[in-house]
Amino acid sequence: MNQPLKTSVKAPSHNGNQPIRVLQHNIIHQYENTNATFLKSSKELVDKMGLQPGITYFVYDEAIQFSNEHFGSQTPFVDGNKKIAIHETFLSYIWVMCYSMWVLYDEAVAKPMQNVQAGKEINKINKDLISSAQELLKYGKSLIKVFTPWDKQNLPNPEEFSTDEEFYIFRANGLFTMAINFILCHEFAHVEKEHIDQIMLRPVGSQERKVFEKEADDRAIELMLQGKNGKNDKSIDLGILIGLCSMLYFSESTSGGKHHPDTDVRIVNFLDQINPSNDDPIWGIAGLFFKIWDDQFNLNFVWPTQINDFKELFYNTLKQVEDKKKKS
């Protein structure tokens, strides 16, 4: 069977090597419009605290764990000169997370559950879509350690797609800009909270660095939530969640190392702040992140066959994460 014709949305202004390049302008637009006063605040930070305008965009066809004289890995950072930097491979990774997790939750979790509740098939499950999302997720996770080019012909991507693929591609694009925006706001907060000044002035110990990171998370969350307008609320919430949960696949441990709080602690801190209802899909997506993490590293978590809601499942999983930490 012939595949539907794919059309490229690449324009001459899209610089870079990977398909994620087509969302460069979306990233900047969302960042500048984080909330009604953000652009004014960022200009004040440039004038008064030395934030460097613009964002450095590194283009290296290398894995996320690649390092050189400019950075220790291809994850976002703000440097000693207060310039925020992002990397093309990391952006690709985050888009993959946004697409795969939304498709897998919608097609492999939510729709089957609705069918069971209705006692009949009210939703047709697209198994091909699930399969392609799983393949894409496998590719995305591989980028942590090994770089290979994105197979635009066979894997979903934001640059070349058919009209049949538009629904989930566009949804992923929206989630992606929110996820990256949370990460950019986190780096922005490090400048605003004078963390960079402190680190450049004096030795800052591990515990204080973790306090800095929590403060940056909290400020980034605050900035993002101030941008809610009734239409983008769910996208903002899910974007922040994906930005945090995507860190799970780097290690079988949720440890944040010497500088960051543990990943599970950061996720719970965010969910506590937005306090979703028990049946909010965000609990199911958070649980799905942990289920795939469990499968990836063979952690042997126990997954109950009957639950009241996804919030219960999430906290059941979280307890197993905490128990694992106590034993290690």
Regions found by a protein language model. Give the residues of each.
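Divalent metal-coordination and catalytic microenvironments
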Residues: 86, 216, 262
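Short helix/loop segments within enzyme catalytic domains
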Residues: 25-44, 180, 196, 200-258
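Long, well-structured alpha-helical subdomains associated
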Residues: 225-328
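Serine/threonine-rich low-complexity intrinsically disordered regions
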Residues: 52, 59-61, 126, 157, ...
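Peri-catalytic and regulatory segments of divalent metal-dependent proteins
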Residues: 4-181, 188, 193-197
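Generic structural motif recognizing short loop/turn segments at the entrances and edges of beta-strands
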Residues: 51-71, 80-82, 206, 236-244, ...
